[in-house]
Amino acid sequence: MKDIRQQITVGIVCLVWLALALLTGEALSPAPLRLFSAAGTTVAIVALAYERSLWQWKLVRRFTGIPLLHGTWRGEVVTSVIREDGDPVPPIPAVLHVVQSASRVSVSLFTADSVSTSTHASLLRGDDGRWCLRWQFTNQPRPGARQRSQRHRGVAELWIGAVPGEGLSGEYFTDRRTYGELTFVEWSPRRYGSASTALAATDFALVAPYAAS
């Protein structure tokens, strides 16, 4: 979105320059046009590079403060659901995968029984300076779990810790009137396609402060 706005700005400047030249009757020189074209191309390339990767650089994030969440997180879900025998469901091992650019973020949450994918997600900074990841999701139970759980929607939010080891913690709510707590304290830069492979992996580590890591 930012790169589009920048290209539009350059285009408007070119049009204004062209209109003024036509109104004053001045001859049009190709040199300024080449200059504006080169400037527009440069702005577009830099904006694209920032959107995809430059924003992740430590030095850049020290100025922007944007937390780096991109990667795979490992933790657990504590749900309000009660089993048929009346006992609460034990904590559920879970894996959170975050895809992040400078302006966009998407979230997928995997457990042994289901996969949740975000339909809308955003990274927000609160009045107290803390960052929060919020998203709306659709949960699709795996075939073996559909007798006890149906497809449903919900919302979730995770507050981002500020010191090593705090990780991500928050809660979720669903349209089935269930809710629960989410906690993720281990992180890996790799992308995993299932909960089982991520939970068995050995390359996860406790997280560090994100704006400075």
Please place each PLM-identified region on the residue numbering.
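Beta-strand secondary-structure signal
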Residues: 70-74, 95-97, 106-108, 132-134, ...
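Tryptophan-anchored aromatic micro-motifs
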Residues: 65-89, 109, 168-174
